[in-house]
Amino acid sequence: EEEDDDEDDEEDVEVDISKCKVTFDEDTHPYTGKAVKPEFTVSYVDEDGDDVDLEEGEDYSVTYSNNRKVSKNAKIKIKGITDNCTGTLVKTFTISKAKQKITAKNVSVSLSKKSVNLKAKCSTGTLKYKSSNTGVAVVDSNGKLNLKKKGKTIITIKAKASRNYKVAKKKITVTVK
């Protein structure tokens, strides 16, 4: 009986991780508030010229560093963990600023209320407000609307960029009746 040599050959292949190719599934890795662990593939080219993927946990281990904040220098360290898969490779990736979301709703309110709070929120917590028609309503730095007369105004709400978030802007309509 002949044995299938292909299985044995594959076991005998020695792979130096430092010569492997690392391919990220996504080009960008936005800030999440947690450790960023991008999806990636580690592969090598076999003697037939084909790409062969290695398996995390079977062929190599992964450790991360500098991967919690926006950085151009977040790192993945890939280390061979078998007799046939040895060596170490460090790959750098970038964590970009995340989009910031402002939550605020259009407001319809009676003039008799005199004032109302917009209750706007964002990722960084710091918001600036501007009323397009201060004759209808004036808004203070805390998002409190002081109602002046019946009508409509557009309130522009801005969140400044921060270390981890991009600038954001949202417009809401305030109707005073």
Where are these regions (language model features)?
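Contiguous, function-dense segments enriched for cysteine-driven chemistry
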Residues: K99, K113-V116, K128-G143, L147-I157, ...
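Enriched for extracellular/lumenal, surface-exposed ectodomains of secreted and cell-surface proteins
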Residues: D25, V45-D46, A74-F93, K158-A168
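Interdomain boundary/hinge segments at the C-termini of tandem beta-sandwich modules
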Residues: E1-E2, F93-K97, V174-K177
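Fold-core signature of tandem repeat domains
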Residues: V22, Y31, F40-V42, Y60-V62, ...
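Solvent-exposed, low-complexity, repeat-rich "mucin-like" stalks and linkers
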Residues: E11-D50, S96-T126
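Serine/threonine-rich, repeat-prone extracellular segments and beta-strand-based repeat modules
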Residues: E47-T86, K130, G135-T156
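Surface-exposed or flexible loop/turn and strand-edge residues in extracellular/cell-surface modules
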Residues: I17-K19, E26, G57, N73, ...
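Long, acidic low-complexity intrinsically disordered regions
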Residues: E1-D12
